[in-house]
Amino acid sequence: MKCSRCTGDAVYEAKHSGEMLCGRHLEESVERRIKREIRDQVDFKKGGVRISVAISGGKDSSVTLYALHELFKDRKNVSLSAFTIDEGIKGYRDSGLENAASLCTELGIPHSTISFSQKFSTTMDEIVENNPEVIPCSRCGPMRRQLMNIESANLDADYVALGINLDDYSQSVLMNVARGDVDRMARMAPHHMKKDGLTRRILPLRRIPEKEVVLYAILNGIKFDSSWCPYYGRAQRNTFREILETLEERTPGTSFSILKFADGIRPALDQSVEKGTMNKCSICGQPTSREICTTCSSS
């Protein structure tokens, strides 16, 4: 099959549009959508902008870092940094840490690591061992988010960029709708408003399907860790992943439609967030909408 935009051989079919793309035009398509998201999510009016990338060493965060570097490498008013969170999962995080550090060295981007054991004096493996009835993701998620906020503040970042692709984002929207969780829906990144004590999170890959992320990484020689978290099988997200995959097979473009829906209700959600107040956890002092943050209340 030939590329829809040139005479080159196609490497990818965008089923939602029916377009066939060669490697060069796939890269251009991905980068154009990333630029669009950056323009929409980052305020450049203030002058110098500092963006820190939360990089796990997997495909999504590695592509996020690489693409932002390509976009801003000649810009004097944007500085990039990166950090990795080590949850303490034996046999899983080591290869990701190595890939993250290697990519940062290759791109000349400063990189740091912060761990659960440093901040919480425990590891994810210990939490699961001591609490076998707990869904691991329900504990890991809040702890990771807290460390993202702490490390991005340490790096004096205006924004923290997350490697969340279109599939991830649409799954999260479905989960929140299914649970009727309006508050969590309102707190979803990208964050357009600054809240005291919180670094705004941006999602450069929000319009990039997972398959395109993988191909972009391969086409650009980006090494990434493809291993799965050993606790992945117990995640509630798996059900919504399967639902979305079925919907995409039957109606290509469903994920883009879910994204459009989320953006459509964003103004109303932003108004509800504006009216909310941000407290400091009475135990650890980190920002929370409650008296005690989720991390402390679960420990």
Regions found by a protein language model. Give the residues of each.
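ATP-dependent adenylation/nucleotidyltransferase module used to activate substrates
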Residues: 2-187, 195-198, 207-220, 293
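Flexible helical/loop "lid" subdomain adjacent to adenine-nucleotide binding pockets
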Residues: 31, 167-171, 177-205, 210, ...
